[in-house]
Amino acid sequence: MSEPKAIDPKLSTTDRVVKAVPFPPSHRLTAKEVFDNDGKPRVDILKAHLMKEGRLEETVALRIITEGASILRQEKNLLDIDAPVTVCGDIHGQFFDLMKLFEVGGSPANTRYLFLGDYVDRGYFSIECVLYLWALKILYPKTLFLLRGNHECRHLTEYFTFKQECKIKYSERVYDACMDAFDCLPLAALMNQQFLCVHGGLSPEINTLDDIRKLDRFKEPPAYGPMCDILWSDPLEDFGNEKTQEHFTHNTVRGCSYFYSYPAVCEFLQHNNLLSILRAHEAQDAGYRMYRKSQTTGFPSLITIFSAPNYLDVYNNKAAVLKYENNVMNIRQFNCSPHPYWLPNFMDVFTWSLPFVGEKVTEMLVNVLNICSDDELGSEEDGFDGATAAARKEVIRNKIRAIGKMARVFSVLREESESVLTLKGLTPTGMLPSGVLSGGKQTLQSATVEAIEADEAIKGFSPQHKITSFEEAKGLDRINERMPPRRDAMPSDANLNSINKALASETNGTDSNGSNSSNIQ
């Protein structure tokens, strides 16, 4: 009878534990690989490489971004786009879902596309989205169109994830090039002379299409004014059934810009001889929402499109694109696609593992400090007077309590690691609220972001609970919909309308040679 083979006690530190998951390519694509002899990007090669989490040489990434920006710079504030066209909403760094979008909407080689902005932030593949979309813009400058969203700016990309992503995957040079390119993005599009397409919505300072054409867009979006409103405004929650007579009210959800009403939209459409407004900017459970119909045309006065399925991996929403052809509008929905996993805020595995190590270290410290009993401490301190001995005992007990508290924090971090990561992902800064971990599981269950950035609370969050509904995820993520604090924000006691009316300097008369909208066909 043969003896059983001994088990090798050595554990390899170089072999991949999960061999079924391929390692990302270490080779960075060169200019010769990305561009053909005519200087056009090979988008199929680029797509295949990015799908494997591959990267480009920095000079190649910069070339794509700057060449795309030079094309965008030549375009007008208000694009004129003919049908047929496929309109897409927010992408938010969900590159693998963007690939699904092109499967559903059609190949960019033979399909006209209009994107309504928000290509970056929140998702962990934002730079891949920018590089691929900008490469498509270089290849198809007359059939693929990109508008600016509220996240295409320095203020939000520094606050959320895009700047950090660029620095980790490439460099700050690439990030700066992206910011310059974002300044070139058009603000709106007139589709088929019937539909105004923007990211956010209307402004009390924009009454005609020429008001959009006259804006100076080549800058960081201001904290208020017509350019801000185009990117940030939303329809009222009770749009079409308003309880107020005001056309525009302060947007309390965003902390800037306005809510606009059904009468405001109908008045704008009638004044400019338009059929509807197409916009993005708000997550939708079904991927789209059609609002109350216009009384004069019988067509929805406003349509929201959102193209990031299972937004943030917790919303459980569908995504949609809008296809308009031969005066027929079709909505095509799609679900999320699998994607590689990143820890929150691009955390590395060593940082992530610290709670596990920390728990063991603090456990050892507590055990060391607990070796001495009260009797032993008392016998050692016979030489001290009563007050000194008592004080020394109290110091040691306080140290034990402090180490014990630290041990409890690390224990919560380890045991509830998944919930902690989810909560981090839903807070604006990626940091946990003060005091959450030291309070243990019960405190984590009622954690709020109050101590971090805002008065809005993340309510109902429990370590044992999984987010299952769209409304729950939207409520938890509400704080992230606000404009982050900025120095040039409008004074809280100022009148919004009077300040916006004073912004005559925002218009410079350029880009005013655009055609007026024609009658609805």
Curated annotation (Swiss-Prot):
Could you give the cofactor binding note from the entry?
Answer: Binds 1 Fe(3+) ion per subunit. Binds 1 zinc ion per subunit.
Which intervals of the chain are annotated as region Interaction with PxIxIF motif in substrate?
327-336
Task: Tell me what reaction this enzyme catalyses.
Answer: O-phospho-L-seryl-[protein] + H2O = L-seryl-[protein] + phosphate; O-phospho-L-threonyl-[protein] + H2O = L-threonyl-[protein] + phosphate
GO cellular component annotations of the record: calcineurin complex; cytoplasm; cytosol; dendritic spine; sarcolemma; Z disc
Q: Where is this region: Calmodulin-binding?
A: 392-406
> What is the uppermost EC class here?
hydrolase
Which residues are recorded as modified (3'-nitrotyrosine)?
Y224
- Sites binding Zn(2+) sit at D118, N150, H199, H281
Q: List the disulfide bonds.
A: none
Which residues does the UniProt site feature Interaction with PxVP motif in substrate point to?
A: W352
The segment annotated Autoinhibitory segment runs over: 407-414
Q: What does the entry's free-text domain comment contain?
A: The autoinhibitory domain prevents access to the catalytic site. The autoinhibitory segment prevents access to the substrate binding site.
What subunit structure does UniProt give?
Answer: Forms a complex composed of a calmodulin-dependent catalytic subunit (also known as calcineurin A) and a regulatory Ca(2+)-binding subunit (also known as calcineurin B). There are three catalytic subunits, each encoded by a separate gene (PPP3CA, PPP3CB, and PPP3CC) and two regulatory subunits which are also encoded by separate genes (PPP3R1 and PPP3R2). In response to an increase in Ca(2+) intracellular levels, forms a complex composed of PPP3CA/calcineurin A, calcineurin B and calmodulin. Interacts (via calcineurin B binding domain) with regulatory subunit PPP3R1/calcineurin B.
Q: Which family does it belong to?
A: Belongs to the PPP phosphatase family. PP-2B subfamily.
Q: This protein is called what?
A: Protein phosphatase 3 catalytic subunit alpha
Q: What is the lineage of its organism?
A: Eukaryota, Metazoa, Chordata, Craniata, Vertebrata
Gene name per UniProt: PPP3CA
